[in-house]
């Protein structure tokens, strides 16, 4: 975008092809160059990240003097009528679900194994109760920078049992890996 002089907009952050990791620092490094070029770069303009950041800003502006704890809970245990269905790009979804969890606690990011923290969450208005798993999601990085009173920030997501079983099978046969696999010596 810088080379062609056009504005930049994304719904999720950059993920390298060969590394199962994502973070905003790679994109934030371009901020000064975009400003000097008079160009806009809007990162994370989807739902999470995106709407979750807007909701947090709205609450901070209109309802709270300070926010100390923030839990973002993405409840969608649907199956779309298929045995295995993701609600986002399947490759990216599998990467983020199988990656180490990072959450913000007492001024720093803490790392725990993927899917190691499970809780139960009851949605309002008879939607139901869901098992949710703490996982890393990129908006945590921008939220703790822009809301410095946060002492804890966590992201949680629900998954249907069929999804979890299929993910386990894919992992067991090596299909959640991103490294190259040789077949017949190639």
What are these language model-derived features?
Residues 2-6, 11-39:
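Rossmann-fold NAD(P)-binding glycine/threonine-rich loop
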Residues 7, 40-41, 151-154:
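Conserved beta-strand segments of alpha/beta enzyme cores
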Residues 24, 49, 53, 133-137:
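Short-chain dehydrogenase/reductase
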Residues 62-186:
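C-terminal catalytic/substrate-binding lobe primarily of soluble NAD(P)-dependent oxidoreductases
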Residues 21-29, 54-56, 166-168:
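Short secondary-structure transition/capping segments
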Residues 30-77:
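Adenosine-phosphate binding glycine-rich loop
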